[in-house]
Design a protein with these regions (language model features):
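Short beta-strand segments
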Residues: 46, 113, 131-135, 174-176, ...
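A general structural detector for well-ordered alpha-helical segments in enzyme core domains, enriched
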Residues: 30, 55, 73, 98, ...
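C-terminal active-site-proximal or functional interface alpha/beta core segments in diverse enzymes
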Residues: 186-254
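Internal alpha/beta core interface subdomains
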Residues: 165-179
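Conserved anion-binding
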Residues: 113-169
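Flexible, glycine/proline-enriched loop segments at strand-loop-helix junctions
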Residues: 104-110, 142-151, 179-187
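A charged N-terminal "starter" segment
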Residues: 1-110, 115-128, 165, 169, ...
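Conserved radical SAM core fold
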Residues: 73-75, 95-98, 135-147, 177-182
Length: 254
């Protein structure tokens, strides 16, 4: 057995270094679960979920995109030889130095939720395509991200008007219902809000073709969430490019 092959001398109780036990087959099975339940969605893995190089290499080989929130995360993906076109800089409030770095790395897609961010992007990365992050109801989630990120729908017209004034290219909408979401209907509500944001984009002369549906997917109720997402997408959207966050790893790495 595998246990019989463990070198007890190098794994004794006095060892000073921690380690993870990884089942990459589980990561692959989680990916296939995505393909089965949400075949119309292009997965973008949130690197912050687990930046273990073996996991990242596997997901890159499977063709996933990557959701990065920092310069370090972006660099780790680029160092693997992944094209910058497969990266979304999903941090809506970045330091000016981060925006300059993204421009130098040819990152062409990022999120925003405030006017100050638009001014920074106009100054340091004006050719970047933008995704407006909207606020959703994350009250049923373990980790509620709405206290930090996301523009209320009432603010979206003002943001889009400023983006148009600055001649910036807004291409879509993103949201996050919060990590550890136990209410599948939260996704329907978020997709309904996203539809309204798409309509606001059209009113400001934009044609959105990108929707990032965030993360929050739980292992135990993923099929229930996927059912709601499929139904809501049929109700509110035609065939767009959709990007979920990072639910491929939690059950595969301990």
């Amino acid at each position: 057995t595998v246990l019989d092959q463990i070198d007890v001398d190098t794994c004794d109780a006095d060892g000073e270094n921690a380690f993870f036990v990884a089942d990459l087959a589980m990561v692959y099975r989680q990916y296939m679960r995505w393909v089965r339940e949400l075949p119309q969605i292009i997965p973008f893995y949130a690197v912050k979920c687990n930046p273990e190089p073996l996991v990242l290499h596997l997901l890159a080989a499977l063709g996933l995109g990557f959701d990065c929130a920092s310069n370090g995360e972006i660099q780790s993906i680029i160092d693997m030889g992944v094209s910058p076109s497969r990266i979304i800089y999903a941090n809506p409030c970045k330091a000016s130095s981060f925006v300059r770095r993204a421009a130098s790395q040819n990152i062409s897609l990022t999120t925003f939720d405030n006017i100050d961010e638009l001014y920074k992007i106009k100054r340091f990365h004006p050719k970047c395509k933008l995704v407006v992050r909207i606020l959703t109801d994350d009250s049923k989630s373990v980790c509620q991200l709405g206290i930090k990120f996301g523009a209320p729908l009432a603010d979206v017209p003002r943001l889009l008007a400023k983006a148009r004034e600055l001649e910036l290219d807004v291409v879509g909408v993103s949201f996050h219902v919060g990590s550890g979401c136990f209410d599948p209907e939260a996704y329907r509500d978020a997709l309904c809000r996203s539809r309204k944001a798409f309509d606001m984009g059209r009113e400001h002369g934009y044609t959105f073709d990108f929707l990032d549906i965030g993360g929050g997917f739980e292992h135990d109720n993923f099929e229930a969430i996927a059912k709601v997402v499929r139904s809501a997408l049929l109700d509110y959207f035609p065939d767009h490019e959709f990007a979920p966050g990072g639910s491929l790893v939690p059950s595969g790495l301990r």
